[in-house]
A protein has these predicted regions:
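Charged docking surfaces used in two-component/phosphorelay signaling
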Residues: 15-23
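The feature encodes the CheY-like receiver
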Residues: 58, 86, 104
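Short, Lys/Arg-enriched segments at the junction into DNA-binding effector domains
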Residues: 2-3, 117-128
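Acidic, metal-coordinating helix/loop segments flanking the phosphotransfer/catalytic sites
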Residues: 30-50
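The short loop immediately C-terminal to the conserved phospho-acceptor aspartate in CheY-like receiver
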Residues: 51-56, 84
Length: 128
């Protein structure tokens, strides 16, 4: 099954993302902070296809989580999901290892399309 780890500190947004991705057929694990994302990633031995990360969170931010996950896995898809819309933030996220960058607000169709696109790339990396 397609597995996604979601790290978002805003409960309303996290629930919205979880519901939409479950409806799209994904197995979703959600956490509310960077520390929990890293702990869950470790506990699950990196057994996720995609990680969705907010950037601005209490404690460890999404950029740091992205960097640490990317150090452990070059094949997992990482999508930044954030209100930060400045070009410098987008470029920074992509430079440290994110595969895509979605700015809030976003629609369910945009979220699903971007997640599906990253999932296809992740699957293709295993076929090669």
């Amino acid at each position: 099954m397609k597995r996604i780890l979601i790290c978002e500190d805003e409960a309303t947004i996290r629930e919205f993302v979880v519901i939409n991705l479950k409806r799209a057929g994904y197995d979703v694990v959600d956490v509310d902070c960077g520390e929990a994302a890293l702990a869950t990633f470790e506990a699950e031995h990196g057994n996720f296809d995609i990680v969705l990360l907010d950037i601005m969170m209490p404690g460890i931010d999404g950029f740091t989580v992205c960097k640490k996950i990317r150090e452990k896995s070059s094949t997992i898809g990482i999508i930044m999901l954030t209100a930060r819309t400045q070009e410098i933030d987008k470029v920074s996220g992509l430079m440290i290892g994110a595969d895509d960058y979605i700015t809030k607000p976003f629609s369910p169709s945009e979220l699903n399309a971007r997640v599906d696109a990253i999932y296809r790339r992740v699957c293709m990396s295993f076929i090669k």
